[in-house]
A protein has these predicted regions:
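N-terminal loops that bind phosphate or other acidic moieties
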Residues: 1-367
Length: 367
């Protein structure tokens, strides 16, 4: 993919269908319940209507696409796990033996594992070979990748969105597997937002105090190694990003292009979503944050997106583990829209709601 082709791709992305959203909002008002009583489920159903163009959208088959890649910054000792874990966990995902893939199996969701930059030969075990290069450069001393490589990785993500559309997937989760990618994600988020590295860097898989201090020092070196144009997402990805983040950025763009609801997982996923929205603000219409990741920096990225996470479970596994859970909530939101009776159908007089409807808001005191 060339930069010109990327711009053409982005220009074809359209915002959600506002007319369908208005119609869905009207239907919500007709359902036999107090206004707003289903909380975020109501907003989800309205947003899904805008994505699909259907007032009563339906959820069918769902999929989690996982982009696996290694990160050269691991050489600096920023992770408690060795580089080899990237490949092994990617293989385990195909066997449905990781946290995310076990949940997906329990719910009957598809899982697609894509090698976009594993630093090893990958055996034929069900992993899709889309390797751009064997891991990234060490961002403490060099760029992670070139612009053509970043574009190639983004194209891998776009391909997965197109494949999801061809396979009639109704929601696509965007996950990752890559030792060291909390470091690259923190660096990308720091550049995009201007936040200090201290505010966006966590312990990842469980660093000791010494390892955590080293991680922050390495990232400061990476961010001062050369000037990075925060308004040029490609430059940010090339300087301090990862192939997984680039591919996920492309996948989020692809979901918007294909009009597929996109499930955002944790820290790495939300940073990639922010990259995509920075490139194309319309992408935001297609994003659903699955859970409030416990990883430092997640909340900043979510706030920049202007979206609220669906679930609050203290999770920080990554992989796309929040996506299968979000799919179930989206199914519930769709089920209400399609199956719940209206006041007329339920033979309920709704005059008692006039006072609530006339008010500016409806709140419930929490204990």
């Amino acid at each position: 993919m060339t930069e010109a082709a990327l711009q053409q791709y982005i220009q074809a992305i359209r915002p959600a269908d506002r007319a369908a959203m208005d119609a869905a909002r009207e239907r919500q008002a007709e359902l036999a319940k107090p206004p707003g009583s289903l909380g975020a489920l109501e907003d989800m159903s309205i947003r899904l209507a805008g994505i699909t163009g259907q007032v009563c959208p339906k959820m069918g088959k769902c999929r989690v696409a996982v982009f696996a890649a290694d990160n050269g910054v691991v050489d600096e000792g920023v992770s408690c796990a060795p580089r080899s874990v990237t490949l092994q966990q990617a293989i385990n995902m195909t066997r449905r033996r990781t946290g995310m893939s076990a949940m997906a199996a329990a719910f009957g969701d598809d899982v697609a594992v894509v090698d976009v930059g594993i630093a090893a030969d990958v055996p034929g075990v069900g992993i899709l070979d889309r390797k751009v290069r064997r891991g990234t450069g060490n961002i403490a001393v060099e760029d992670a990748m070139t612009r053509p490589e970043a574009l190639a990785a983004m194209a891998v993500g776009m391909e997965q969105a197109a494949r999801a559309r061809a396979d009639s997937i109704t929601a696509l989760g965007i996950g990752e597997m890559g030792i060291g990618n909390t470091s690259t994600s923190a660096a990308v988020l720091s550049v995009l937002t201007g936040a200090d590295i201290e505010a966006v860097t966590g312990r990842g898989g469980g660093l000791t105090d010494e390892g955590f201090a080293r991680k922050k020092d390495v990232l400061r070196r990476a961010l001062t190694r050369r000037a990075v144009d925060k308004d040029d997402v490609l430059d940010v990805l090339c300087a301090v990003g990862g192939l997984d983040i680039a591919a996920m950025t492309g996948a989020f763009l692809g979901c918007a292009r294909e009009r597929i609801p996109a499930a955002v997982d944790g820290f790495i996923s939300v940073v990639a979503a922010l990259c995509a929205v920075t490139l194309c603000p319309e992408v935001r219409d297609y994003l659903f944050l699955s859970h409030d990741s416990y990883e430092v920096g997640y909340r900043l990225a979510a706030d920049r997106l202007g979206l609220e996470p669906c679930l609050h479970l203290g999770m920080r596994l990554g992989e796309g583990s929040g996506c299968p859970l979000l799919f179930r909530v989206l199914e519930g939101a769709c089920g209400v829209m399609a199956g719940m009776a209206t006041f007329a159908q339920a033979a309920i007089q709704d005059d008692y709601l006039d006072e609530i409807r006339a008010g500016d808001s409806f709140t419930v005191d929490k204990p």
